[in-house]
Amino acid sequence: MNIAKLIDHTILKANTTKEDVMKVIEEAKEYKFASVCINPTWVKLAADELAGHDVDVCTVIGFPLGASTTETKAFETKDAIAKGATEVDMVINVGALKDGDNELVEKDIYEVVQAAKGKALVKVIIETCLLTDEEKVRACELSVKAGADFVKTSTGFSTGGATAEDIALMRKTVGPNVGVKASGGVRTREDADKMVAAGASRVGASASVAIVLNDAKGATDNY
């Protein structure tokens, strides 16, 4: 298995500098990761630097709380795509899900899917650490109904990250035709292999190089 092609090489910290982003971009070129996942402010730089390379440009929408309005998320998506993003990882409205407002949650995802249609993959971050199993299932079902390409465990900025149990539940819920992304706390090759075995088709990590090189030291970042 070519683990590198399953990894979104990620840097999303608030204090990320241009030098940090360039390092991630160069590593993505060298190790041929699936994508670089960066904050929207870095999308144009990443798109320019990765032109001609088989590495997608992934960014985040409504991140990390998911509490911005649907209209804002749709605009963010269009803006990111205009600047060169080919994948977007959006955060659901977690509070609305917990309120049982399925209509709002689905519309929130649907509008981002429509904004990205034909131009970028949409991954929906459900923030599993804040949800009951019933809520995880419902979030996945609403994501599929709204037309998302992937469901994703975590932002890496909340109270917990990916677990093999959550990945298995999400895979069972969405079936074989929707992607499942494990993110948050995936730091070693062993972590990544566990997630893939449980059903993940993509892994988000900042420790991507350590994972590929099977460096047991891994990394300390949550993402």
Swiss-Prot record:
MF terms (GO), sorted A to Z: deoxyribose-phosphate aldolase activity
First-listed, main subcellular location of the protein, grouped into a coarse class: cytoplasm
Subcellular location: Cytoplasm
GO biological process: 2-deoxyribose 1-phosphate catabolic process; carbohydrate catabolic process; deoxyribonucleotide catabolic process
Residue numbers annotated as active site: 89 (proton donor/acceptor), 152 (schiff-base intermediate with acetaldehyde), 181 (proton donor/acceptor)
EC numbers, comma separated: 4.1.2.4
Name of the protein: Deoxyribose-phosphate aldolase
Species whose genome carries this gene: Bacillus cereus (strain G9842)
Gene: deoC
